[in-house]
Each structure stands twice: as structure tokens, then as C-alpha cells.
């Protein structure tokens, strides 16, 4: 029987999925994750020593009534650590559950200056984009007097001290550069 043919009421259950060339073989790869994320599939973790029985929705009526009497499995809870899960699925699941917020760095003198000047530049030039604002603020910073720049350096020292009190064990750890292709 062709697995793509329409089934009639007395049709036997197709066991095409036991064939190594079965069309759903592709779901054993990363494509499965996309199907799960888009709601076109689901992930079930099968513990070692168990074999899942997959029955297409079009054939599930064969299990109703007095036909094939399969024992109804009872749900069992497992933690992810107890299951053999493909790495690409486990990695994406752990991202959601273990996402920790990074401690913000204390602002330096230029950041404080830029924050203040950014708003005033946007008020005076509403059509200006962020790239142009950055260039203008950088130019303005280089042309500022030592007194003005010292004021911002003192402000940054104050923020650094506040940051030290809030996060006593903080140590700046820059992110590693990813390899460019």
C-alpha cells in the first residue's frame, strides 16, 4: 500500500515508518526543531529501553472501538538530564531556562556626555539619524574644554563607585569575538 493513498475504514495500519527510507526520516535532523518551533510538530523524549509507536492521524480511528487493543501508556515525567536529547534541541531549551542578565558596565565619561547630548541634538535636528548623531557627538567631545570633560570624568567616577557598591564582585568580562565567515 502506498503511504500517500487515502485509507478506507477497514484499512490495516501502515508500517511504512519501519522502512529505513521512510519520508519522515528527515525529522531526525535539525529540521525537526523548525517544525516544533512553527507548531507543525512536537518533541517527545523516549527514554532508553522504550520504543515509540507512531500512528498517523488519518489512521488513529483504527485504534477506537473493538479493533486493535493497545495498552494506553501512562505519562511518566523525566527531567532533561535523564533523557538522551539531541544537542541542538537541548541547547535551545537551555537558552530559555538559564538566561541570566548580564551586569551592566558603569558608564564612562563619554557615554554620559553622549547620553546628554543625544537628546538635545535630536530636538534641534529631528531628521538626523543615529549614525550622524554619533559622529557629531564624537566631534563635540573632542572639541570640549578640559573643564567640561573633567566634569564628566568626575561623574563617571561617581557612577563607578555606586556600581562597585551595588556589584561588589563585578569584573568586566568582554564577550569573545565570533569567527567571521
UniProtKB/Swiss-Prot annotation:
Q: Name one GO molecular function term.
A: RNA polymerase II cis-regulatory region sequence-specific DNA binding, bending
Q: Does the keyword Transcription apply?
A: yes
- Induction field: By nitrogen starvation.
Tell me which SMART domains the record gives: HMG
Give the top-rank taxon of the lineage listed in the UniProt record for this protein: Eukaryota
Record keywords, A-Z: Cytoplasm, Cytoskeleton, DNA-binding, Nucleus, Stress response, Transcription, Transcription regulation
Regions recorded as binding DNA: 103-171
| PROSITE patterns, sorted | HMG_BOX_2 (PS50118)
The UniProt entry, under Pfam families, shows: HMG_box
CC annotations in GO: chromatin; cytoplasm; nucleus; RNA polymerase II transcription regulator complex; spindle pole body
GO BP: any one term: positive regulation of induction of conjugation with cellular fusion
* Subcellular location(s) of the protein: Nucleus; Cytoplasm, Cytoskeleton, Microtubule organizing center, Spindle pole body
What does this protein's UniProt record list under function?
A: Mating type proteins are sequence specific DNA-binding proteins that act as master switches in yeast differentiation by controlling gene expression in a cell type-specific fashion. Positive regulator of MFM genes. The HMG box recognizes the DNA sequence 5'-AACAAAG-3'. Required for conjugation and efficient meiosis.
What miscellaneous comment appears in this entry? There are three genetic loci for mating type genes in S.pombe, mat1, mat2-P and mat3-M. Cell type is determined by the alternate allele present in mat1, either P (plus) in a h+ or M (minus) in a h- cell. Mat2-P and mat3-M serve as donor of information that is transposed to mat1 during a switch of mating type.
Name the chain's protein.
Mating-type M-specific polypeptide Mc
Gene (name only) = mat1-Mc
Amino acid at each position: 500500500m502506498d503511504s500517500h493513498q487515502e485509507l478506507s475504514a477497514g484499512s490495516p495500519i501502515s508500517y511504512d515508518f519501519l522502512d529505513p527510507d521512510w519520508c519522515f526520516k528527515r525529522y531526525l535532523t535539525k529540521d525537526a526543531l523548525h517544525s516544533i518551533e512553527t507548531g507543525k510538530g512536537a518533541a517527545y523524549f523516549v527514554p532508553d529501553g522504550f520504543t515509540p509507536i507512531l500512528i498517523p492521524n488519518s489512521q488513529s480511528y483504527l485504534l477506537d472501538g473493538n479493533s486493535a487493543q493497545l495498552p494506553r501508556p501512562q505519562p511518566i515525567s523525566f527531567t532533561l538530564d535523564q533523557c538522551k536529547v539531541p544537542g541542538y534541541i537541548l541547547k535551545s531549551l537551555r537558552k530559555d531556562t538559564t538566561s541570566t542578565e548580564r551586569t551592566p558596565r558603569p558608564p564612562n565619561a563619554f557615554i554620559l556626555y553622549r547620553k546628554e547630548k543625544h537628546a538635545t541634538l535630536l530636538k534641534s535636528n529631528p531628521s538626523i539619524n543615529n549614525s550622524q548623531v554619533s559622529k557629531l557627538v564624537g566631534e563635540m567631545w573632542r572639541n570640549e574644554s578640559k573643564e567640561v570633560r573633567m566634569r564628566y570624568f568626575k561623574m563617571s567616577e561617581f557612577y563607578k563607585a555606586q556600581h562597585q557598591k551595588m556589584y561588589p564582585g563585578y569584573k568586566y568580562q568582554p564577550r569573545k569575538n565570533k569567527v567571521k565567515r
